[in-house]
Every structure is written in C-alpha cells, then in structure tokens.
UniProtKB/Swiss-Prot annotation, chains A, B, C:
<feature type="topological domain" description="Extracellular">
    <location>
        <begin position="362"/>
        <end position="390"/>
    </location>
</feature>
<dbReference type="Pfam" id="PF00909">
    <property type="entry name" value="Ammonium_transp"/>
</dbReference>
<feature type="topological domain" description="Cytoplasmic">
    <location>
        <begin position="412"/>
        <end position="451"/>
    </location>
</feature>
<keyword id="KW-0924">Ammonia transport</keyword>
<feature type="topological domain" description="Extracellular">
    <location>
        <begin position="33"/>
        <end position="63"/>
    </location>
</feature>
<feature type="topological domain" description="Extracellular">
    <location>
        <begin position="296"/>
        <end position="298"/>
    </location>
</feature>
<comment type="function">
    <text>Functions as an ammonia transporter. May play a role in the elimination of ammonia in the gill.</text>
</comment>
<dbReference type="InterPro" id="IPR002229">
    <property type="entry name" value="RhesusRHD"/>
</dbReference>
<feature type="glycosylation site" description="N-linked (GlcNAc...) asparagine">
    <location>
        <position position="44"/>
    </location>
</feature>
<feature type="topological domain" description="Extracellular">
    <location>
        <begin position="238"/>
        <end position="247"/>
    </location>
</feature>
<dbReference type="InterPro" id="IPR029020">
    <property type="entry name" value="Ammonium/urea_transptr"/>
</dbReference>
<feature type="transmembrane region" description="Helical">
    <location>
        <begin position="217"/>
        <end position="237"/>
    </location>
</feature>
<feature type="transmembrane region" description="Helical">
    <location>
        <begin position="248"/>
        <end position="270"/>
    </location>
</feature>
<dbReference type="InterPro" id="IPR024041">
    <property type="entry name" value="NH4_transpt_AmtB-like_dom"/>
</dbReference>
<feature type="topological domain" description="Extracellular">
    <location>
        <begin position="173"/>
        <end position="176"/>
    </location>
</feature>
<feature type="transmembrane region" description="Helical">
    <location>
        <begin position="88"/>
        <end position="108"/>
    </location>
</feature>
<comment type="similarity">
    <text>Belongs to the ammonium transporter (TC 2.A.49) family. Rh subfamily.</text>
</comment>
Length: 451, 451, 451
C-alpha cells in the first residue's frame, strides 16, 4: 500500500464494477414492477389514476431524495479541504446503497411469489436505509477510503434490513420516521466503526479537521434542506390521509422549537457568548430525529415542541461536553458528531415513541387507531404492551448496531492525510497541497507501514 | 453594554428559552389538530384519502418553505462578511415567527370553540407571515442584534395578523399571494424600523457592505429558488382546481417577462453597460411580488407579462435612482433594497389587483366567480365595489406597517461593527477579523457609549 | 466593436425590450387559458378538484424547473471566473426561451380554434425546450455574448418545435424524456454552433477554462439537483398512473447504476487513479439521458440499470479520449463536454428506445399499451414498425440539429477574454481582473479587429 492513489486506480474500479454487475444480475433475477408501476397489472383493474400511490408519495420521496444527496452531502462539506470527499463519496455510497437496500429490504420483507416488488414505497425505503449508512459515514468522515465506505455500506445495509425486519415485521414496532431503525442504528453502527478504526495520531491532521468561512456556508445548504424536508421524511411512508398530514405537522413544530433551543444553548455554552456554527448546523436538526417514531402518533403540536426543545438542548450539550470525552476517554473520533445529532436524539425519539404508544386510547384515536397501531386496534395487544414492544425495539437496535459495527474491518489512509481531498481527488492546481510536501508525507508513512 | 458578545451570552439564551417556553405553554392551552390531521375526526366520516387537503397543498407548502429558509436566507448572503448572520439569523427568526404566527393568526381568524386548529393551510399561512418578517429583516440586515430581531419579529407578526384580519376577514379583500399583506406590509414596516435606527456613521462599515465573488454566487442560490417557487407561493392557498393552476401559470409568465426587463434595465443603467448582480438578484423577482394579488384572477398570461415587465423596470430604477435618495435625504438605510423588491412592486401588485377585481364579470369567470370573488358571486357587492375594497386595503396596509414600525425601539451594535459576522458568530480563525483590531474598535465604542 | 461593454449598454437593452414586447403582443393575440386553468370552463362541467391536471403534474413541473434554473445554471459554474455568466446567462436565456417555446410549441402542436392553450403541460413542455437550449449553451459557454445567446435561443427554440412536431405529431414517435428531442437535438445543435464559432487562439484564455476548489463545489449543486430530479423530468409528461410511476422508477435505477460506472471509470482513466470532478459532475448524469425515451416503456429496472451502466462508461470515455480529438481534429471546442453528457447518451437512449419499442408485446403491456404505444394498441402499426419509426426519428433529429446549428452566425468576444465575467458583469473590486491589464488586452484586440 505504498501509494494510496495507485491502489485506487486498480481497486476502486474493480470494486465499483463488480458490485454493479452483481446488482444488475440480482435485479434481473429477482426484481419486478409492483402492481402500481406495471402497465398490464395496473390496467387490469378499474380505478382512477389519482388512486395510484405515486400521487400520494412521490413528492415526499423527492424531498427525502434531496435530504439524502444534498442534505447529507453538503452538511459534511464544512471541512475546509474535504468538500469533494463529503459530497462526492456521499454520492457514491448513496447510489450503491439504494440499489443494495432495494434487494435486502425486498428479500426480508417485500417478496411476492419469489420476486421483489418495487415502486415508490420501495424507493423511499431504500433511501431511508441509505440515510442510515450516511449517518455512519458522518462518524468516519475524512478517515476512510471509498472502498472501505462501500464495504461498510454493504454490511450496514444488510444489517439494517435485518433489524428493520425484526422490528417492523416480527414485533410490529411503529417507527415511520426511523428514530430507531435509521438514526439510532446508523449512529451507533458508525460510532463502533470509528472506535475500531481509532487513530492515535489523528492530531497530525487536526489543522484540516475544521472549517473555513465558505465551507460553513456550503454546510448550511445541507442543514437547511434537512431541516425543511424533515416533515416529508417522517411522513413519507405513514398511512395515507390524516396520518401523513399529522406527521408532517408534528415534525414542523418539533423542529421549530428545537431551533430556538439550539440558538439559546449555543450562545450559553460557547466561548464569549457567540454562536457556534457546529451547533446551528447540527443540533437544530435533532428535533426531526426525536419525533421520528412518535410523529405519526397523536403527539399533538404541544408534545412535539417539548420533544424538539429537549432534543436541541441535549444535542448542544453533547457537542460541548460529551464529544470531547468520547474522544479522549473512549477513543471515539466522531468527525461530524453524529452521536449528538442522531445517536442521543434517536434514543430520545424511541423513548418518546414508547411512552406515546403506551398512552394511546380509542378515545383519542377513534377508528384512526387502525392506521397507527393496527395490533392495538384489532385487540391482539393493548397499548401498554405496544409501548413495551417499542422499548424492546430500542434495545434490539442498539445491540445489532454495536455488534454490526464490530464486524467491519479494513486498512486505511495514514493519519497525516486525513480530511484531505488531494488523496482521492484531482484538486485544482492552485489549491492542491504542495506536491513535494504530500510526497514527503507519503514516503514517511510508507516507511512506517512497511517497517 | 461594554462588550457585545458578553451580553449575548446572557441575553440571547434567556430570550430564546423564555419565548419558546411561552410558545409551548400557549400551544398546550390553545392549539388542536384540525379535522384533516386528527386521527379520530378524519376517520369519523367517510371520504377518500386523496380528498385530504394534504395532497392539494403540501407540495406547495414545501416550495414556500424552501423560499423562506433557503430563498430569503441565501439571498442575503451577498454581504462578504455577513453570510453566517444572513442565513443563521434568518433561520432563527423564521423558526420563532412561524410558531408565533400560528398563534396570532389562529387567534384572529382560526378559532374553533376556543381552540386554534392547525393543518397544512395554517402551516402555509404561518410561513407567509414569516416571509413578511424576513422582508423587514432585509432592510435592517447587518445592523441589528438577534435579540432585536426577535423583538421585531414578535411585534411584526402580531401586527401582520391584525392587518390580515382587517383585510381578509373584515373587508373581504382578495390577496392570495400577499402583494399587500406580505410584501407591502413587510417592506414598509422594515423601512420604518431602519429609519428609526438610522446610523449616521454607517460609512465606517461601508467596506463590509458589499459582496465578493463567491458571496454573490451564494446569493444567486437564494434568488433562483425564490424565482422558481414563486408560482407555488402565490397559488399555495388559493381555491383548489383551476384557481391554483391559473395562479401558478400567471406567476410563471410574470416572472419570465420581469427577468428580461431586469437584464435590459440593468445593462442600460449600469456603469459601462455591464450587468449588475444586485439587479439580477433582486429585480428579477419583482414580477412575483406584483402578481401576488391578481395572480388568482383572470389576469391572463398577457396581463401577467405586462405586470411583470413593469415590475422589473420599476425595481431596477429604484435600485439605481431611488435608494441613494432614500438614504441621503430620508435617512433610510435599506441594506437589501427591500423597497425596490417588495415595496414598490407590492404597491403595484395591489393596484393591479384592484383594477382586475373591478373589471371582473360573470361572462369571464362563470361559476368560478364563487372561488375568486365570493362576495361578488353571491351578489352582496358588485365588482367595482370589490375593486374599491382592494384599493382601501392598500392604504390600510401602508398605514399599519408604517405606524407599526414606529413602535419597535431598542439598543444596537456600534456603527463600526455592522455587516460583520465576528460580532455574533465564531468565525473560522484564518478569516476572523484581526482580534486586536476588533478589540480596539470595541474599546473606542465602549468609551463613546459610556461617555 | 472597440469596447465590448459599451456596445452592451445599447444592444442588450434593445434586444431584451424588443423581444419581450414582441412576446407580450403575441401572447395577447394568441394565448388562452386551457380548460383546466380557466375559471369559467373548469366550472362549467362537474368533476372533482383533484382531477385537475395540476395535481398530477405540478410537483413534477417544479422539479423540472429546478433542473433548468439551478441544475443547468450551477452545473456550469465550475469555471473559476465565469460563475456570474454561467448562472446569470442561464437565467436570462431560460426566461426568454420558455416564453418563446410556449408560442412555437403551441403554434406547431397546441392550437385550438386559432388560440394556443396553456396550462401545466405547456409549462413543462416549454421548460423541456428550454433545457435543449441550455445544453447548446453548455457547448459555447464562456465564448459568446448574451445577445448571441438570445439569438441562438430564438432559432433553436423554433427548430426544436419543428423537430418535435415532426417526431411526436407526424410520425407518432415516443420520446417522453427527450433522449432525442431534447438531448440529442440540443447537443448536436450546440456542437455545430461551437464548430462554426471556432476560435483558433482560445488557448489565450486557457488559464480561465478551469475550476477552483469552491467553483467545483458550486457545480456539484447543479449536478446533484439534476441527478435527483431526473426521474421527475422523464416522467413529467407521460400518461397518468402507472406510466409516470414506472418512468420515475426506471430513471432512478438507471442513474444509480450510472453513478457506480462513472466512479469506476473515473478512477481507471484519471491521472494517478484519482477521481476527476469533471466526470463526477457530468458522466453520472448520463444514465438519466439514456433512459429518456425508453423510461416510460416496460424496460424493467434490470434493463434500466444496464442502460445506465453503459451510459456512464461511454460518457467518461468520451471526456477522456473523444473530447480532445474533437477539439484538435474537428475544431469543436465543447466547453462543458455536452457531447459526452447529452450527445452520445442521447443517441444511446434513442437506440434503446427503438429496440424496446420493437420488442413490445400485448403480453407484457396489456391494456397499458394504449398509454405507451397508442398506434400499436389500436392496430394501425405493429411494434417492429414503431421501432423503425423511433430509429428514423433519431436520424431526423440529428439532421435538423446539425443543419440548424449552421444557420446561426454572428460576432463574438476576443479569444483573450473568454471565460471571464469581467467583460459582461460588474465584478466585486478585490476580485476583478486588473483594470489596466483588461484595458491593455482590449486595446490589442481592438487594434487587431480594426486592422
């Protein structure tokens, strides 16, 4: 592994081509249009075109799609010299993950007569699973090669589908916006991976692990898109009608309350009482994570705002006090602070969901109970039992995520060349790191590695 | 007020927390899901899911949401050293305003049995009201603290709701896209505030009150999003069916015509015949403002294009000739030129609306008259009277906006530190203003203030 | 033409105003609301509001709109000193083209009783035609004045409408996403224009014909938006129901497969095995172009992925090996490489469409055949004949595009001042090219021109 770039020339194309060819073969063998996308099937029955699920979900799908590719992609461009890697590797692993997720999710809970049926709902679910992988990417940002990222994605998507299957299909857990399945899972999986890949000499790349003025503005593009479209994210696969409507509304208020909490906490904890861009870029989003489970329930705007408010506070405190401890004591180098944005708020969201579920009554939900808690509506379990199932699901998710993160093992770029686009990308000349310097560093590293 | 930042550490958190806690308590006491978001209510009656208002309005809502947070936020990033403040304070006051607006608008015209009902329409209305506050923010950009901005937002939202109540509920004025209620109101309110806060020594910050190459590109993100989604803005709360469709179409053509007028006028008025980014970023949007009232009417594409064309011309002329006079003679320092983008085009839009209303006939509108002019359709007034009501509404809006702007009073950052992120934000080191210099300036200011 | 800017002061306003006034007059004489946007017409019949085409197509329209103004606009900002021109001229010619296209397309295939009917479908079609013009703009980027661009747009829109009329109306060709009508047409038209405008001394502007770090990030905004919303582009005007749904799905998978192929090919062909931003920004989109014709057909996800995979490979190979040859041997200076992104993938898309059409059977399409191949469904031609028509359409498109590009002739900025915003835009002082230097260059050029 004398030269990082030379090995890329061989390995990356091989990995990309082999993965894509496998995907194509499996799609050829297993994937079919579902009832609503198939010309013959759809026209076989009589109904109106506006009943096609496309019109209920496609606008939400596109909002989710923007969150995955622009939201996550640009949120991570805050690093001064890792903008190409942030948005570019995000693009690569997302494009891979959504294909692989279609297969894995289809395999575990979408088979119909030996075939995986696809349509707008499977597209949303694949994007959701991809979101989880991108959360983990945030934890290891700047310290991994694209090949490692693709490997990680392959494992993580698989385990995501397993966890999702256990929760949604076996246990009947409700988690429409994925506080558990997406955020908690992605965060703790990523934290475990970054722990295993601990780099004792990462401080050698410390000067690059920070932002410049314009990179912070690029990151704000990601933040704002995530913030705006989170109501679509949480409501994208809830039941039609009041459910989608209510989930969007709850998320909207949770995020608004979270934002005020974030600004207040940022000023109170920061140096000199100034606002810290890291908090604004991340903690203001915690409100969306924290109503991912309970958003479809009758949480009320009041309840949503309380949850969002708490999520903002917890998240800023995490950035200020917990992250340094995680790094120094537990050797967890969490580049984007996903523990503060997705980890803790995800756990909070799971708990809120469990409590809200346990308190559900027919008096509040009426016939709408069938949409939100079908098992409670048909009398097979009672509400408090549903709450217990929700709580159990959190534990299972944490277990699978942490164990799953342990599985992934591999080789990585030297500590001196982290957070640096020049390793994997052609960088415009004027801004490229001094070639000589780069070479020197490489040589040193090579010596170390080969010694 | 010796040190701006120290006072932020105390005041901003206190203000944020108190405001949010008050909001949460009021939401708990007053706010309820409406018929279409409530699980029990919606399921109590028989209807198809696609009849839920969510599917008629949510895509438009998301477009409006993008205009508020990305559109306004990035439009103002043109300042070279105030990008964090532009997008960051925009974020803060918008998140506050939309919550406060839900309460105020609900209080004035959304109470049902002592409760404020919320759903996608209230979300759009709250975003609309927020837009008005952000217009005013444009007038004072770079010269106010976040606490002042929150105070301004609190007053402005309240008065916005009062004005809206008088127009829409008492008088039966039509103003779906808010030429009067949003743009005229926001602009003249903001101009009055910036007049009261007149800074005689603002030329000390003159070198920062300008753009750099990349800040102009960031601002174009805001411009283009506002331009693209304006058809959704104007049509978001018009009646279902032909009304939403027609409004979007009219706005689309008005904006296209406005853009050509803007480029032509920019070249003719600018130094050396070159195009001026300030014009492109702002005047090209005036066409959307100017069909805010008449867009839902049978204005025809032809009429819409004439209105857009005029709006573009007026707006560029305003930037070139009127803004300097307003500053030098009337002491109105309008940072973003909101008078040219929202003020004059808003007044034009109100006049166009009044004339178009006065000319409405059953021959043109048919049974569609019920949607656009219900009072004319049921015979309680005739079209010319509706035109009169529209004109009166403009006068009322101007009066309330200007008087309202007078109410807001407070203390502000020193003239030497305007348009500077370093006052309120942690700025990445390499780009921070020289610490010594900042300190010196502060000390001087402190001396002045305490003397 | 002694001074470029002086002539702009006169010519650009005159051109903009005359064009817009002509447009307004023609709209006044010819354009009418269609059935679904007209208050009287829509209310004359009984139907539900959700049957209005607005709800089937407006969200797709807005996605297409974003692709046209943000997608194309920002994709071209990769040039270090031509960001204003990229996004600003894109804005100008798009705003003109969509109005002119409404007239031309209406004239050729939208007349009803002597009037052109407009609604959401005409808006989408106008945006599509605009897209074609912007593709041609990509070929000549940085080397043409705004007046030339408007002239080119005027001719190109007209010929686009002629070609579209021949294909869709006369021959019954299927091309919902425009592999032929939009991409192939726009690319070869633009390549012919740039060939005629060949600049032997363009290497004098060579140092500006490249990117800087942040300009590449701005370009990624354009890329990602194009990528995300391409499913909406291809499905925007297909039949309601399964057709829109299926087209979006096929495009989604084609793009994902294309992205992996692009990353692999970029690493294998680039210097040192590093990824090249030019490939990522462009080739990853070829998958959307290549399913523009067959996307609405029963191509299956499997077929879509194969097409996308091939498109990505072809596109990167084009950038690496074909573009340099086109420039050195054929004197085609293709600034954005539109031949690789739109030309070859467009031709591939046409071929895939012809083959897929030829293979269509009732067994696969059932009653859905009426939506996709109405002429095959009603028995007037058989599937293999439809395939032949598709192939013929490609030849016609290539012919009209290449001949059309020959027509456009004009005068242009000097070779030394290409790719430079300072010629047409007020550039913030600190970054403006040294005034003296600019003057010197101008003087030299003037001498040459006048000699």
């Amino acid at each position: 592994m004398a030269d990082v770039s030379t090995s890329m020339r061989l390995k990356l194309p091989v990995v990309c081509f082999i993965l894509e060819i496998i995907l194509i073969i499996l799609f050829g063998a297993l994937v079919q249009y579902d009832y609503e996308t198939d010309a013959k099937e759809w026209h076989n029955q009589s109904h109106n075109d506006y009943e096609n699920d496309f019109y209920f979900r496609y606008p939400s799908f596109q909002d989710v799609h923007v969150m995955i590719f622009i939201g996550f992609g640009f949120l991570m461009t805050f690093l001064q010299k890792y903008g190409f890697g942030s948005v570019g590797f995000n693009f690569l692993i997302a494009a891979f993950s959504l294909q692989w997720a279609t297969l894995m999710q289809g395999f575990f809970h979408g088979m119909h007569g030996g075939k995986i049926h696809v349509g707008v709902e499977s597209m949303i679910n694949a994007d959701f699973c991809t979101g989880s992988v991108l959360i983990s990417f945030g934890a290891v940002l700047g310290k991994t090669s694209p090949i490692q990222l693709l490997t990680m994605a392959m494992f993580e998507v698989t385990l995501f589908a397993v966890n999702e299957f256990i929760l949604l299909s076996l246990l009947g857990t409700r988690d429409a916006g994925g506080s558990m399945t997406i955020h908690t899972f992605g965060a703790y999986f990523g934290l475990m991976v970054t722990r295993i890949l601990y780099r004792p000499h990462l401080d050698k790349s410390k000067h690059r692990n920070s932002s410049v003025y314009h990179s912070d503005l690029f990151a704000m593009i990601g933040t704002i898109y995530l913030w705006m479209f989170w109501p679509s994210f949480n409501s994208a696969i809830t039941a039609h009608g009041d459910d989608q409507h209510r989930t969007a509304l709850n998320t909207y208020y949770s995020l608004a309350a979270c934002t005020l909490a974030t600004y207040g906490m940022s000023a109170v904890t920061s140096h000199d009482g100034k606002l810290d861009m890291v908090h604004i870029q991340n903690a203001a989003l915690a409100g969306g994570v924290a109503v991912g489970t309970a958003g479809e329930m009758m949480l009320t705007p009041f309840g949503s705002m309380i949850v969002g408010f708490l999520a903002g506070i917890i998240s800023v405190l995490g950035f200020k006090f917990l992250s340094p401890i995680l790094e120094s004591k537990l050797k967890i180098q969490d580049t984007c602070g996903v523990h503060n944005l997705h980890g803790m708020p995800g756990v909070l969201g799971a708990i809120v969901g469990a409590v809200t579920a346990a308190l559900a009554t027919m008096d509040v939900y009426g016939k709408g109970m069938e949409d939100v808690f079908p098992a409670v509506a048909d009398g097979s379990i009672d509400a408090s039992k549903q709450g217990g199932v929700q709580a159990l699901s959190l534990a299972i998710t944490l277990g699978i995520a942490l164990l799953g993160g342990l599985i992934v093992v591999f080789g990585t770029p030297p500590d001196t060349l982290c957070f640096e686009d020049g390793v994997y990308w052609e960088v415009p000349e004027s801004e490229a790191p001094h070639e000589a310097q780069l070479t020197t560093v490489r040589t040193e590293e090579t010596e170390k590695l080969s010694s």
